[in-house]
């Protein structure tokens, strides 16, 4: 966070963040034998703006992010490398409602635009021209979860020097859970990719489309284990219901430390 302030009845927070990622995919041939691997090392830098209406709780998040990709596809005695840039812009809003003292329902709406541009590359077999691709997404859903006070109490340790720090039983830890079902619509998906060899007439162009609708379910749990340390886990599943057939799973573990 770079700035936190109050403006016209609203809480404003803005800042920057960085991230590094690595993915590795094993590729199989038609007969199930190993064909090779695809790896992607990525570094991201982004900025965010968060606005919260003090009286109603209505909030909005604006995010812009750029990512540098370094990709490598490897097979027996053959390597293919490509570098490029990805970008993402997101606008998300939500309005929380209290169902009970510690249970909250929050309708959410999000718009995302993302794109990817990779350099052309080649290996011993031929060449690939990736071109530029982009897609837009609208997500509508809600978040249902607990809204317990996450303040870290003094605990019940018999040793005074440990109260408020290390000696808290599991039942004393501040914990919140949540589930988030959503419908995601992808549209304006575009991007061509062509490949071929040195032989005349070998060039082929593919125009994959990601347009369609999918259902997404996310669930998570977070617990404050120290005054300044929060642990969290999250898992999700997405399945397309129209357009191209696809499904996916995701999982995430987080460690937040404040100082």
List the model feature ranges, each with a label.
Residues 43-46, 131-259:
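Outer membrane beta-barrel transmembrane domains
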Residues 95, 115-117, 148:
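Sec/Tat-exported extracytoplasmic proteins
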Residues 23-40, 68-87, 114-142, 187-198, ...:
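Extracellular/periplasm-exposed beta-strand and loop segments of Gram-negative cell-envelope proteins
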Residues 108-114:
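Internal active-site segments that recognize and position negatively charged phosphoryl groups
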Residues 1-108, 119, 236-257:
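Outer membrane beta-barrel translocator domains of Type V secretion systems
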